Regions:
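ATP-dependent adenylation/nucleotidyltransferase module used to activate substrates
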Residues: 1-174, 204
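Functionally engaged cysteine thiol sites
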Residues: 16, 184, 198
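Glycine-rich phosphate/adenylate-binding loop
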Residues: 172-189
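Iron-sulfur (Fe-S) cluster-binding segments and ferredoxin-like electron-carrier domains
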Residues: 188-220
Length: 220
């Protein structure tokens, strides 16, 4: 069986890469260049994919997504201009576009399974990270691609960040998560015991919080 994994180079998608390697015979990783402020994540993703022994392909989707602090390199701690209840990092349509491209790529290589690291437990309120959204898109892709049923797997959907750290330990990729993954929205490469980043942005704060919770529980 073949699976396509959306690999950004961050903690969650890298953990899902190793989940996919345990659950599928062939794994193909894809990433997206959307002019993100932390574009170094793509370099890290390529390194991670090579170490994992999987093929990695980057799609250029610059100019196809709505404005956000990630695209415009703005203040990630402010609310979104689209909805004040969402953070500025919310990029409308991002996961929908990425998963649709992944579906098309599945058709090209003869795969039926997509793996993504979206999560609605410790997430930032992104509406495209909810399981209801994923289910709706899974149905649309299954109907529209003409290749039979598409399955979108979300191994982290109901896990806290601390539980995601534990999963990395279980999969034997904890060292890789700490050493190689880039979660920081600003692409800060300062190294700490929990990995690279700076606690000036929400993504890194969540990563750090989960790390110390997992450590306190004896999971890592």
């Amino acid at each position: 069986m073949k699976a396509v994994i959306l690999l950004s180079g961050g903690q969650d998608s890298t953990t899902c890469l190793y989940w996919a390697k345990q659950n599928f015979k062939e794994v193909y990783a894809i990433g997206f260049d959307y002019n993100q402020s932390h574009k170094i994540e793509l370099e890290q993703a390529a390194k991670i994919a090579k170490e994992a022994g999987v093929e990695y392909k980057i799609f250029n989707v610059q100019g196809l997504l709505a404005k956000s602090s990630l695209v415009e390199h703005g203040d990630h701690n402010q609310p979104s201009h689209l909805d004040k209840s969402l953070p500025a990092s919310f990029t409308a349509g991002r996961n929908l576009l990425f998963l649709t491209i992944a579906g098309s790529y599945c058709a090209d290589i003869g795969a039926s399974d997509i793996v993504t690291g979206v999560c609605q437990t410790d997430y930032s309120g992104y509406p495209d990270c909810r399981r209801t959204t994923i289910d709706a898109l899974q149905n649309a892709l299954s109907l529209g691609l003409g290749i039979g049923g598409i399955r979108i797997h979300t191994p982290l959907m109901y896990l806290t960040k601390a539980e995601t750290w534990r999963l990395a330990k279980d999969f034997g990729c904890l060292e890789i998560i700490i050493r190689d993954t880039m979660t920081d929205y600003n692409g800060d490469e300062t190294m700490h015991e929990w990995g690279m980043g700076n606690e000036s942005n929400p993504a890194t704060k969540l990563r750090v919080k989960g790390f110390y919770e997992a450590k306190e529980k004896g999971w890592i």
